[in-house]
A protein has these predicted regions:
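Active-site glycine-centered loops adjacent to acidic/histidine catalytic or metal-binding residues
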Residues: 190
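Metal-cofactor-binding active-site regions of metalloenzymes
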Residues: 1-185, 194-199, 205, 209-210, ...
Length: 236
């Protein structure tokens, strides 16, 4: 099968991070300068998740206002349409973009407006997964998820937990997701990406219906647990 044939196949993208999916052209336009590929991607010598996550800092500078978030949503669906993606679930962390000029509701709405315009122009269906971040406080994360619930079924489909897993184990977030269940918000959790496999078990016990970026699911008893609980297999 050729590259062109692969491009023509219809695709579904279930694990896409907004700030990791912006085109180089979009980043350069927003920053008003040339950007090298090295600024946007890790080298083969990358040794940790923390080092990897630093590459999200530059794209994040493009998402500081409503125009940037609108444009980012539009840009992502534009580039996905070129790969014949027909449906995408796009993750982003609203609290990264909150400022004196934009509250959480405005942040989410700005992205959804851009995605909706992209859907109309390029025919790509979408949903948004709002990410709580491990280094944010429980209060901050809960308030973000509560606000995102206003958009549930109107562009937002779920919440997530992402960030430096080794520094913030899953045990610190059990109460957050107990409260998230009470809000009626479905959720997926990044777990087992680094740190120990117990984070996967804890994420499932917390109520996650999906586990993302989970290398440790190759362990036999973890696989059995995933099968018994009917968890959607991890997106690597």
């Amino acid at each position: 099968m050729t590259v062109n044939e692969l491009r023509q196949l219809p695709k579904i993208e279930l694990h896409c991070h907004l700030d990791g999916s912006l085109s180089k052209e979009f980043v350069e336009t927003r920053l008003q300068r040339a950007v090298s590929c090295e600024e946007l991607s890790v080298s083969d010598e990358c040794t940790s998740l923390v080092e990897y996550l630093k590459k999200f800092d530059l794209p994040g500078q493009c998402l500081t206002d409503e125009e940037g978030l609108f444009g980012a949503g539009y840009d992502v669906l534009r580039t996905m349409s070129q790969e014949n993606v027909c449906y995408a679930e796009i993750r982003f962390a609203p609290l990264f973009h909150v400022s004196e000029q934009m509250n959480t509701e405005q942040v989410i709405e700005s992205l959804l407006n851009g995605l909706e315009k992209g859907k109309k122009d390029f025919g790509v269906e979408y949903n948004v997964i709002t990410c709580a971040m491990r280094h944010h406080s429980a209060k901050q994360n809960y308030q973000m998820i509560k606000t995102a619930c206003q958009f549930l079924g109107r562009g937002v489909c779920a919440a997530d937990l992402a960030g430096a897993e080794a520094q913030y184990p899953m045990t610190e977030f059990m109460e957050l997701f107990e409260q998230t269940k009470k809000l009626g918000m479905p959720f997926t959790i990044h777990a087992g990406e680094c740190g120990n496999a117990q984070n996967i078990v804890d994420a499932i016990e917390a109520g996650a219906k999906r586990i993302g970026q989970s290398c440790h699911t190759r362990i036999k008893h973890i696989l059995h647990l995933i099968e018994r609980r009917h968890i959607l297999r991890p997106q690597i």
